């Protein structure tokens, strides 16, 4: 999931801060998701999926 989230963010040309603002989390939390330090809860995964225009399954199961 971490690599997918980072790749999606870079592809969308967004900063960790921009993603964090959208999902209601800090820049550090987004960084933690991107480097395997933590995983988003289901509600946050849904927001990330919406932000990156992908399915929640893609995020949760790292497809």
Regions found by a protein language model. Give the residues of each.
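Helix-turn-helix DNA-binding elements, focusing on the entry/boundary residues of the two helices
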Residues: 5, 16, 27, 42-45
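Recognition helix of helix-turn-helix/homeodomain-like DNA-binding domains
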Residues: 24-39
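Conserved short acidic donor-positioning loop in nucleotide-sugar-dependent glycosyltransferases
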Residues: 62
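DNA major-groove recognition helix of helix-turn-helix/homeodomain DNA-binding modules
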Residues: 24, 43-58
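Generic anion/oxyanion-binding catalytic loop in active/binding sites
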Residues: 8-9, 20, 34-37, 48
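Conserved hydrophobic/aromatic packing and binding residues within compact polymer-binding modules
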Residues: 5, 19-20, 30-33, 59
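Short basic helix-loop element that most often maps to the first helix and adjoining turn
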Residues: 3-22
């Amino acid at each position: 999931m971490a690599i997918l989230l980072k790749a999606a963010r870079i592809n969308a040309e967004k900063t960790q801060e921009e993603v964090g603002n959208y999902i209601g989390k800090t820049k550090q939390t987004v960084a933690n998701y991107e480097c395997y330090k933590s995983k988003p809860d289901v509600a946050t995964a849904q927001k990330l999926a919406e932000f990156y225009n992908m399915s929640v399954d893609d995020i949760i199961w790292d497809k």
